[in-house]
Amino acid sequence: MGARGMILDRLGRELRDLRISITDRCNFRCAFCMPEGQDYEFFRREEILSFEEITKFVKAIIPLGIKKVRLTGGEPLLRRDLERLIKMLSELPMEDLSLTTNGFLLKEKAKALKHAGLKRITVSLPSLRDEVFSKLVGREVKVSHILEGIEEALRVGLKLVKVNVCVVRGLNHEEIVDIAKFFKGMGVIVGR
């Protein structure tokens, strides 16, 4: 703890951002994210924090200097009634509430998320090519489906849409410039 009651990292810097994994479930099996093998043991439902517990925790930690909260997973859009959690958190005094997703369910959920109070969204998009994308995420997926979700997020007015590209040498490392060019002028930030 810092002198002003702030949470400090190992280098003595004030922590202002909080990432909360609201589920360990995911509809993808990304090589760069999920544990290998079929024997991965997910948390039991009763081991996952309830929306009320998450909100209580965030409310308690805001006075310690937290300004931004990012919801992650697994895939947070798989969490049932996620919009209710977004609404609960958006009513707390913080600067930013965002979510990181693989984008597969975004087209269907963007409007409700925005309406509930979500401000920003980050979509993991490792490739614009279906075959490379599918190989990296461990299931057959049309990239166009993810792009439609990003377009919907922009259409409903999410203020900041970011695309993260996990670069894997030999698979998608040559695509980063193409991905940046693809989103240029669309109001989407591309990062890695």
PLM ranges: what are they?
Residues 48-70, 78-173, 191:
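Radical SAM/AdoMet-radical enzyme domain recognition
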Residues 9, 17, 24, 39, ...:
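Acidic-enriched, low-complexity/disordered segments with a strong bias for Aspartate over Glutamate
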Residues 3, 7-10, 18, 40-41, ...:
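Short, functionally important structural connectors and interaction interfaces within domains
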Residues 2-17, 177-181, 185-187, 191-192:
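Auxiliary Fe-S-binding modules of radical SAM enzymes
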Residues 28, 32, 42-43, 51, ...:
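Phenylalanine-focused residue identity feature
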Residues 10-49:
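Canonical Radical SAM [4Fe-4S] cluster-binding loop centered on the CxxxCxxC motif
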Residues 75:
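Conserved G/P- and acidic residue-centered "switch" motifs that form tight phosphate/ATP-binding loops
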